[in-house]
């Protein structure tokens, strides 16, 4: 618990008193099922042992004082519960504001302020959901602090709403759901249209999940994420003229092939094809994992990346370089981009004995080609967000 002692010292230095409670919210990695969540499809994410810590103490007034060790230079960000508007100078604390504002709108009134210290071990902008981790962390803190008695699925939904309506990023439910509902050593098969979910045990004996970060600067809100979403919505509208469906995730591959010529724009056709095929790939991948067939699972991961590169066009030279170098390496059974894309991370399944060699070799070759180093994390699968003292 050394990290908690370190954070306690920081809390005392900044707020001149002890914290009352400490919470942890994981990051997440999606093993397969990318850009399917807002298309009514399935995703297969898991929560990680890296994440965000939150130390908190209540106040008697209506002020919130927030400090992040990851944004030291911004100091303490102070705002009033009477003025929960998004503003640029409040930077990362807008995520906290957004969750409070959304709780209020749902009738869970937050009437007291608090002091909060955040520390995240998830690299910002890595695509491992540092923003959703902060949102869910804020949600469970509010739930505990004000004894609101809200179940985790409702917290998750409100956190997604905060990101959509307050922050302005049109994300699906996957990030917040996997962070709130994660389970140690399991991945979650989530149907994003119904929120039905089931856990699959990850039997990784002899293998490791290795995440490689491109370290490319990226911003989700101003990336092409919203553009992809509207392209899929436009394709869906055309398909709805001939078939009674609510989302692309309802179509099988065969149904899509039969109907695809209805989509007049070739770009929108490619976007829709990815959404349909990726959803089916995800379902096949879960079956293979449940049968302990890691080889097929890896093959489907590779196919997922190709589709994200060619049909969805969200990869870029950095992610493509990491994946192609991974697939040339010994002991790798699957590799793909994970997250929204446009930078961020890849996830690879690597034989344990080859992990060091994998990292050294890719680091050197990527740096030579791209001009700066990637970072690597060997991750374990964790429980969802929770109070830890």
UniProtKB/Swiss-Prot annotation:
Binding site for substrate: 34-37, 225
Disulfide pattern: none
Main location: cytoplasm
EC number: 2.7.1.6
Domain of life: Bacteria
Pfam families on file: GalKase_gal_bdg, GHMP_kinases_C, GHMP_kinases_N
Entries under SUPFAM superfamilies matching the protein: GHMP Kinase, C-terminal domain, Ribosomal protein S5 domain 2-like
Record keyword DNA-binding present: no
PROSITE patterns linked: GALACTOKINASE, GHMP_KINASES_ATP
UniProt-recorded Gene Ontology molecular function terms: ATP binding; galactokinase activity; magnesium ion binding
Cell location: Cytoplasm
Biological-process GO terms, alphabetical: galactose metabolic process
Pathway per the UniProt entry: Carbohydrate metabolism; galactose metabolism
Annotated positions binding Mg(2+): 131, 163
Keyword field: ATP-binding, Carbohydrate metabolism, Cytoplasm, Galactose metabolism, Kinase, Magnesium, Metal-binding, Nucleotide-binding, Transferase
One GO term describing the cellular component: cytosol
Active site: 175 (proton acceptor)
Protein family: Belongs to the GHMP kinase family. GalK subfamily.
Functional summary from the UniProt entry: Catalyzes the transfer of the gamma-phosphate of ATP to D-galactose to form alpha-D-galactose-1-phosphate (Gal-1-P).
Protein's name in the database: Galactokinase
Species of origin: Clostridium acetobutylicum (strain ATCC 824 / DSM 792 / JCM 1419 / IAM 19013 / LMG 5710 / NBRC 13948 / NRRL B-527 / VKM B-1787 / 2291 / W)
């Amino acid at each position: 618990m050394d990290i908690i002692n370190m954070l306690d010292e920081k809390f005392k230095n900044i707020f001149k008193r002890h914290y009352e409670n400490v919470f942890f919210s994981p990051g997440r990695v999606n093993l397969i099922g990318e850009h399917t969540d807002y298309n009514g499809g399935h995703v297969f994410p898991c929560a990680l042992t890296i994440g965000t810590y939150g130390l908190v103490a209540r106040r008697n007034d209506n002020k919130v004082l927030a400090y992040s060790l990851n944004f030291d230079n911004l100091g303490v960000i102070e705002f009033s519960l009477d003025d929960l508007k998004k503003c640029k100078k409040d930077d990362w604390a807008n995520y906290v504001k957004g969750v409070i504002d959304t709780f209020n709108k749902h009738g869970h009134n937050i009437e007291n302020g608090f002091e909060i210290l955040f520390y995240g071990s998830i690299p910002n902008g890595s695509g491992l959901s540092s923003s959703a981790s902060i949102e869910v962390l804020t949600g469970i803190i509010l739930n505990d602090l004000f004894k609101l008695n809200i179940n985790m699925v409702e917290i998750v939904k409100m956190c997604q709403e905060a990101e959509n309506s307050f922050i302005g990023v049109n994300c699906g439910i996957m990030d917040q759901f996997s962070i709130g509902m994660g389970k140690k050593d399991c991945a979650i098969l989530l149907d994003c249209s119904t929120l039905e979910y089931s856990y699959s045990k990850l039997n990784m004996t002899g293998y490791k999940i290795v995440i490689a970060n491109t370290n490319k600067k990226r911003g989700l809100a101003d990336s092409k994420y919203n553009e992809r979403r509207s392209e899929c919505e436009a394709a869906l509208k055309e398909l709805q003229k001939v078939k009674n469906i609510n989302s692309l995730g309802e179509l099988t591959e065969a149904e899509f092939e039969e109907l695809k010529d209805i989509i007049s724009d070739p770009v929108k056709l490619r976007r829709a094809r990815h959404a349909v095929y990726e959803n089916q790939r995800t379902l096949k991948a879960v079956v293979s994992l449940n049968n302990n067939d890691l080889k097929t699972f890896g093959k489907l991961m590779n196919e997922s990346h190709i589709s994200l590169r060619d049909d969805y066009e969200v990869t870029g030279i950095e992610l493509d370089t990491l994946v192609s170098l991974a697939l040339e390496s010994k002991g790798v059974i699957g590799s793909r981009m994970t997250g929204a894309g446009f930078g961020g991370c890849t996830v690879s399944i690597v034989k344990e004995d080859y992990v060091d060699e994998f990292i050294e070799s890719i680091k050197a070759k990527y740096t030579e080609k791209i001009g700066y180093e990637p970072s690597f994390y060997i991750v374990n699968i964790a429980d969802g967000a929770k109070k830890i003292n």
